[in-house]
Swiss-Prot record:
Gene name of the record: pth
Annotated family: Belongs to the PTH family.
Subcellular location: Cytoplasm
Coiled-coil portions: none
InterPro entries linked to this entry: Pept_tRNA_hydro (IPR001328), Pept_tRNA_hydro_CS (IPR018171), Pept_tRNA_hydro_sf (IPR036416)
Alphabetical GO biological process terms: protein quality control for misfolded or incompletely synthesized proteins; rescue of stalled ribosome
Catalytic-site annotation from UniProt: H19 (proton acceptor)
Quaternary organization: Monomer.
The protein's role, per its UniProt record: Hydrolyzes ribosome-free peptidyl-tRNAs (with 1 or more amino acids incorporated), which drop off the ribosome during protein synthesis, or as a result of ribosome stalling. Catalyzes the release of premature peptidyl moieties from peptidyl-tRNA molecules trapped in stalled 50S ribosomal subunits, and thus maintains levels of free tRNAs and 50S ribosomes.
Gene Ontology annotations for the cellular component aspect, listed alphabetically: cytoplasm
Binding positions (tRNA): Y14, Y61, N63, N107
Uppermost EC category: hydrolase
Listed name of the protein: Peptidyl-tRNA hydrolase
Keywords, sorted A to Z: Cytoplasm, Hydrolase, RNA-binding, tRNA-binding
Length: 179
């Protein structure tokens, strides 16, 4: 079974921040699926199951996301992990896909890499870069950024549904957005 993980931070103060685009995409996906909500304490996150995959929003805060991913992956013996995350090295509105590689300094990916290895698939959503990286990723999207955000999330949603039935190379060639 496939595990789709959206990275983000829990708490209302982090809702709609750049670091939470993974959570945002999971929420969009769940709106279009029939899902059962599973235990959240055992897996340190909100876990949902559909006929296509498990969907996880870790509740460990970003730096410990790997604990939640490992708990679900080990318990359900997931043979495929797809992680959705923000990427400051990509311009706002950019959408890219890859397998493995470095964390690029992303603490959520570092945590997953440390506990699960790095051979998982990644859906990278560009949020742009600022001199103060922490304030930038923990900042909310500006009004003028909403159109780009909505566009990339809709494209990523279509890509994810296809990715669950296909491979990342095919999806990348069809759905990547370069900004």
């Amino acid at each position: 079974m496939t595990l789709v993980v959206g990275l983000g931070n829990i708490g209302e103060q982090y809702a709609q921040t750049r670091h939470n685009v993974g959570f945002m995409l999971i929420d969009l996906l769940l709106k279009d699926l029939e899902v059962a909500k599973l235990s959240n304490t055992k897996f340190k996150g909100e876990l949902f199951k559909s006929s296509l995959a498990f969907f996880l929003k870790p509740s460990t805060y970003m730096n410990l996301s790997g604990e939640s991913v490992k708990a679900v992956s080990d318990f359900y013996k997931c043979d495929r992990i797809i992680v959705i995350h923000d990427d400051i090295d990509l311009n706002l509105g950019t959408l890219k896909f890859k397998i493995g590689g470095s964390s690029g300094g992303h603490n959520g990916l570092k945590s997953i890499d440390n506990l699960c290895g790095n051979a998982y698939e990644r859906v990278r959503i560009g949020v742009g870069k600022d001199q103060d990286v922490i304030s930038h990723v923990l900042g909310k999207f500006k009004q003028e950024e909403q159109e780009s955000l909505n566009k990339v999330l809709e494209q990523a949603k279509k890509a994810l549904f296809e990715l669950l039935k296909s491979n990342i190379e095919q999806v990348a060639s069809k759905y990547s957005i370069r900004n």
